[in-house]
Amino acid sequence: MDWLILLKALLLGIVEGLTEFLPISSTGHLILAGDLLNFNDDKAKVFTVAIQLGAILAVCWEYRERLVNIIRNLGTRQANRFVINLFIAFLPAAILGLLFIKTIKHYLFHPMPVAIALVTGGILILWAERREHRIEAETVDDMSWKQALQVGCAQCLALIPGTSRSGATIIGGLLFGLSRKAAAEFSFFLAIPVMFAATFYDVYKHREFLYIDDLGMFATGSVAAFISALIAIRGFIRYISHHDFTLFAWYRIGFGLIVLLTAYSGLVDWSVD
């Protein structure tokens, strides 16, 4: 295994883990990072999807006690309500993804659309933060099915790379009456079925690019994603306990503008093919 490939896998794994659960778009960052590292062929695209498993497992580990309790208490009203809400929120993006993902990947999975989505998403976060929030659900257990559906519809925006799945669901949650912590935690829980389904579906469709010789590359990226995602989740929950999402909005806007400016100035040759 080429050491340069392993280094790229390590860097992309760290990028995936640090950005997956923050409202800054992991897909957008991976597309841009892959372009800079010249790691954007078909095998690389499967790799960036597969290493999401590391990030998913980080959520499962961080909330393992809660997940075990839900499984043990299936059949009770509270546990059933939580599972049903997750299923309701999962459906909109799953349906739209199956219908339009090929078209979206063909036209939008490139640096320039990502940069535009980063800036647009940042502006929307600033707008959402300036709205008055009426909290109707302090915890995920207080959520109604209607709020779950609304968050699920908001998640559909994340099909556009650069938008951010966590950003769309968290900000959507705030707009629809969830507390900051409830919005963030529901976003984390919702990531489990969404990312598992998307990862296995995409990897299965591109299984011809999977080889035993690449096991080291996939393992390196997945472990890096797991560790960095665990750090990001814990830090993010602590941060939003005392702050809003304005910092992430300005980061998105700044990063997106840098990509656009470097592209149009010719300083960086972002690929568009």
Swiss-Prot record:
- Domain of life (superkingdom): Bacteria
Q: How does it sit in the membrane?
A: Multi-pass membrane protein
Q: Name one GO biological process term.
A: cell wall organization
Catalytic activity annotated for this protein? di-trans,octa-cis-undecaprenyl diphosphate + H2O = di-trans,octa-cis-undecaprenyl phosphate + phosphate + H(+)
Question: Which region is the signal sequence?
Answer: none
Q: Which residues cross the membrane?
A: 4-24, 43-63, 82-102, 108-128, 183-203, 217-237, 248-268
Localisation per UniProt entry: Cell inner membrane
An example Gene Ontology CC term for this record: plasma membrane
**What InterPro entries would the database entry show?**
UppP
- EC code(s) of this entry: 3.6.1.27
| Principal location class | membrane
Name the enzyme's class: hydrolase
Keywords attached to this entry = Antibiotic resistance, Cell inner membrane, Cell membrane, Cell shape, Cell wall biogenesis/degradation, Hydrolase, Membrane, Peptidoglycan synthesis, Transmembrane, Transmembrane helix
Mind listing the GO molecular function terms for this protein? undecaprenyl-diphosphatase activity
State its role. Catalyzes the dephosphorylation of undecaprenyl diphosphate (UPP). Confers resistance to bacitracin.
Similarity annotation: Belongs to the UppP family.
The further comment given in this record reads: Bacitracin is thought to be involved in the inhibition of peptidoglycan synthesis by sequestering undecaprenyl diphosphate, thereby reducing the pool of lipid carrier available.
* Protein known as: Undecaprenyl-diphosphatase
Q: Give the classification, highest ranks.
A: Bacteria, Pseudomonadati, Pseudomonadota, Betaproteobacteria, Nitrosomonadales
